[in-house]
Amino acid sequence: MPLYEHVFLARQDASAQQVEELTTQITGVIEGLGGKVTKTESWGLRSLTYRMNKNRKAHFVLLNIDGPAAVVSEIERQERINEDVIRYLTVRVDEHEEGPSAMMRKADRDRERDDRGPREGGFRGDREGRGDRDGFRGDRGPRRPREDADAPAAAVEE
């Protein structure tokens, strides 16, 4: 049977439990038509690049599906009807990716970075409250006197 990766976005105001129920419902449709879900990943509530149907965020869910084409057409039909689903995308793949998807690996990498703790000296490092513009910078000399715009160019050159 063909292999598919299916991602759908659920509305931001849907609870995690509602998204889980929606995933269970879609999985039931797939299994009812002779397919099977080999992997389910919930990527959580993430920001959208642009507003979709007045939503700025959405719950992202990935399903790896092994089943006939009729399964895909039926779950897409069900998702068009369901008001909680903002967008969906199904892609046929040659083989499913083993282990966590790229999005989950990225989330793990971000969590590892957060484990490093705060930087020494806070955000500003060793600048001790000196911003870019505070106090005398000492890297510039005094300003040159302004030349009058009214004076002719020959008089300025002397």
Curated annotation (Swiss-Prot):
GO terms for biological process: translation. CDD domains: bS6. It comes from the Bacteria. Keywords: Ribonucleoprotein, Ribosomal protein, RNA-binding, rRNA-binding. GO terms for molecular function: small ribosomal subunit rRNA binding; structural constituent of ribosome. GO terms for cellular component: cytosolic small ribosomal subunit. Residues 92-158 are annotated as: Disordered. Residues 92-149 have a biased composition (Basic and acidic residues). InterPro entries: Ribosomal_bS6, Ribosomal_bS6_sf, Ribosomal_S6_plastid/chlpt, Transl_elong_EF1B/ribsomal_bS6. Gene3D superfamilies: 3.30.70.60. Pfam families: Ribosomal_S6. Belongs to the bacterial ribosomal protein bS6 family. Binds together with bS18 to 16S ribosomal RNA. NCBIfam families: S6 (TIGR00166). The initiator methionine may be removed. This is Small ribosomal subunit protein bS6. It comes from Rhodopseudomonas palustris (strain ATCC BAA-98 / CGA009). The gene is rpsF.
